[in-house]
Each structure stands twice: as C-alpha cells, then as structure tokens.
Amino acid sequence: MVKLRLKRCGRRQRAIYRIVAIDVRSRREGRALRKVGFYDPIKNQTYLNVPVILYFLEKGAQPTGTVHDISKKAGVFMELRLNHQTKFN
C-alpha cells in the first residue's frame, strides 16, 4: 500500500518537509516512489504537484493526516471530485 506522507529534510531547528509517495512499510527517511511536493512550516510555503497527487489518490494511495490537511487547503480534493464527476457524465 502506498501513502502520501511527509519526509523531513533541512537542518536542525529548520525543518523542511518533502511530500512523497512512499510504501507503508518504509521508514520516514526511506526511499520514496516519487516526490510530489514540499512544505515549509516556518515560511508557510507549500508546493504541490497536483496531477501526480491525483494520480496516486486515484490508484488508492492514502494521505496521512497532515498531508490530507495541506492538500485540502490547496483544493486537491475539489479537483479529485471534479475529475470523478466528469468521468460519470
């Protein structure tokens, strides 16, 4: 199973997180399947590669709580909902 979760980068007391698609059994700093964005909590900056995130979500990837909140603020789930509506109509 694949999860979308945060991978810690940066230096001590100055954490930056990459949002990655990674196997559930891998550790936090393990090898990721794909980098899909980053999150800087200090500067409050976020970059999300939305098409790649939508691809993984459609294939069954589960986001962690924090990644879910970040994606929700960016409107990723609205785009996912719109994609499903266009397929059925």
Curated annotation (Swiss-Prot):
- Tell me which InterPro entries the record gives: Ribosomal_bS16, Ribosomal_bS16_CS, Ribosomal_bS16_dom_sf
Gene Ontology BP term (one): mitochondrial translation
Q: Which UniProt keywords apply?
A: Chloroplast, Plastid, Ribonucleoprotein, Ribosomal protein
Query: Subcellular localization, per the record?
Result: Plastid, Chloroplast
* Domain of life where this protein originates: Eukaryota
GO molecular function terms attached to this record: structural constituent of ribosome
One Pfam family recorded for the sequence: Ribosomal_S16
What is any one of the record's Gene Ontology cellular component terms?
small ribosomal subunit
Q: Keyword Endoplasmic reticulum, does the record have it?
A: no
Residues in coiled coil: none
Q: State the similarity comment.
A: Belongs to the bacterial ribosomal protein bS16 family.
**HAMAP family cross-referenced by the UniProt entry:** Ribosomal_bS16
Can you say what this protein is called? Small ribosomal subunit protein bS16c
Source species of the chain: Morus indica (Mulberry)
> What gene codes for this chain?
rps16
